[in-house]
Curated annotation (Swiss-Prot):
InterPro entries: BTB/POZ_dom, SKP1/BTB/POZ_sf, Znf_C2H2_sf, Znf_C2H2_type, ZnFinger_BTB_dom_contain. GO terms for molecular function: DNA binding; DNA-binding transcription factor activity, RNA polymerase II-specific; zinc ion binding. It comes from Homo sapiens (Human). SMART domains: BTB, ZnF_C2H2. It is found in: Nucleus. This is Zinc finger and BTB domain-containing protein 8B. It holds the Pfam family BTB. Residues 467-479 have a biased composition (Acidic residues). Residues 24-92 form the BTB domain.
Length: 495
């Protein structure tokens, strides 16, 4: 069996110990104020303190002190009271500070509770404002109806008996129309925060006036339809008000019906300065009978032909709305938005996937292009090409250091940097006895060739032939071999 009162009693005892500073082994400094607490309570409820106290597990005897710079002292005091009592003291003034402090201390339960509190508070305020607006609208409608009734009665009393019937009919019409106007004002207050009906529905008023100026047959056959702007509903109020909205509002009138209902030569006076009208135009373009952009432009040009010259601002606003819907216009061609490829490591974006792949190599360190001669790797192929042309000089002939011959193509990897051809790296001495083969010491060859290089004007090694003429192989052999043989004989006598 569980005792529900045990938890509250245990928390109460711990809170009493904290207030009396009994067995408190932790201190938190916030904005100069010192708060005493127990490590176990902080460790069990806060992820921030859990990560902070994990370093002091072995040093259980030491007194821990933490300093918080981001959290306010009032918010931390409320959170600390919640840890020891389970009660969170929230109000409209401190809920934001408490929620930010709980988020910093990694207390998800407190954050979710604050969000719920904010949502419920906003719902209550919204309902109160809505009820007040409806009550004010009903009172205004009742006052208008009473004033209209008084005016009608006064008109009936002042007129002659012969025209009394006409006055009575007119008064009846005014009485019938005044409640409709009251309902209209109530709907305007519900739909938008502004109370001016003229700013909320400019299209509706103009269409009604134009339809009222037509023939009586058209008024009887085609009743005026209402144009309602796009209204953004709150997610919590949609389920409650959707039935009422569907019953009260008629179907929205598209642009083609407006043009058919208007008489020829009369233009629609559009007020584009209102934000709700812009939303309505976006919805109108989305649901219009014109299937393409050209048809929509044709409809708008027809409806705006009779506008005065002083309506330049309204025209510019219309083009802004149209550009937002269709995208950028370049003459008669519609420019399709370009898809940008985003780097997963930084904010860099590229128009082509290959460019982004090359950019990602700067983050990963990948170098997929190695040099065949020296083994150095590069991120781009053109860098490898320039490296091969500038460093290894593959197109220039090189004079061998041993035999003084020029060589370009008959090379193995890495021999170009030593300046020796293949024949000089494999030179051997062939005495009378073919069975005993002694390899040539290349260090002696280099020592003998150094004396010849000192007399040369060019001291760079390896030596490159700039003129492109190759030396005579026969002449080089006749000059160099007699010098190599004495050195070898001296070496043999020394050993």
């Amino acid at each position: 069996m569980e005792m529900q009162s045990y938890y509250a009693k245990l928390l109460g005892e711990l809170n009493e110990q904290r207030k009396r500073d009994f067995f408190c082994d932790c201190s938190i400094i916030v904005e100069g104020r010192i708060f005493k607490a127990h490590r176990n309570i902080l460790f069990a409820n806060s992820g921030y303190f859990r990560a902070l106290l994990i370093h002091y597990i072995q040093d259980s005897g030491r007194h821990s002190t933490a300093s918080l710079d981001i959290v306010t002292s009032d918010a931390f005091s409320i959170i600390l009271d919640f840890l020891y009592s389970g009660k969170l003291d929230l109000c409209g003034e401190n809920v934001i500070e408490v929620m930010s402090a709980a988020s910093y201390l990694q207390m998800n339960d407190v954050v979710n509770f604050c969000k719920t509190y904010i949502r419920s508070s906003l719902d209550i305020c919204r309902k109160m404002e809505k009820e007040a607006a409806v009550a004010a609208a009903v009172a205004a409608a009742a006052a208008a109806a009473a004033a209209a009734a008084a005016a009608a009665a006064h008109q009936v009393d002042s007129e002659s008996p012969s025209s009394g019937r006409e006055g009575t009919s007119c008064g009846t019409k005014s009485l019938v129309s005044s409640p409709a106007e009251g309902e209209k004002s109530v709907e305007c207050l519900r739909e938008s925060p502004c109370g001016d009906c003229g700013d909320c529905h400019p299209l509706e008023l103009v269409v009604r006036d134009s339809l009222g100026g037509g023939s009586a047959d058209s008024n009887l056959s085609t009743p005026p339809k209402r144009i309602e702007p796009k209204v953004e509903f709150d997610a919590d109020e949609v389920e409650v008000d959707v039935g009422e909205q569907l019953q009260q509002y008629a179907a929205p009138l598209n642009l083609a019906h407006v043009e058919e209902a208007l008489p020829s030569g009369q233009a629609v006076d559009l007020a584009y300065s209102n934000y709700h009208v812009k939303q309505f135009l976006e919805a109108l373009l989305r649901n219009s009978a014109a299937p393409s952009k050209d048809d929509a432009d044709h409809h708008f040009s027809r409806s705006l032909e009779g506008r005065p010259e002083g309506a330049g601002v309204a025209m510019s606003s219309m083009m802004d709305v149209q550009a937002d819907w269709y995208g950028e216009d370049s003459g008669d061609v519609l420019v399709v938005p370009i898809k940008l490829h985003k780097c997963p490591f930084c904010p860099y974006t590229a128009k082509q996937k290959g460019i982004l792949k090359r950019h990602i190599r700067s983050h990963t360190g990948e170098r997929p292009y190695p040099c065949e001669t020296c083994g150095k790797r590069f991120t781009r192929q053109e860098h490898l090409r320039s490296h091969a042309l500038s460093v290894h000089r593959s197109n220039r002939p090189i004079i061998c250091k041993g035999c003084r011959r020029t060589f370009t193509s008959h090379l193995s990897q890495g021999l170009r940097r030593f300046g020796l051809c293949d024949s000089c790296t494999c030179v051997t001495d062939t005495p009378d006895d073919d069975d005993d083969l002694m390899p040539i010491n290349l260090s002696l060859v280099e020592a003998s060739s150094e004396s010849q290089e000192k007399s040369d004007t060019d001291n760079d090694w390896p030596i490159y032939v700039e003129s492109g003429e190759e030396n005579d192989p026969a002449g080089d052999d006749s000059d160099d071999k007699p010098q190599i043989q004495p050195n070898l004989s001296d070496r043999e006598t020394l050993t």
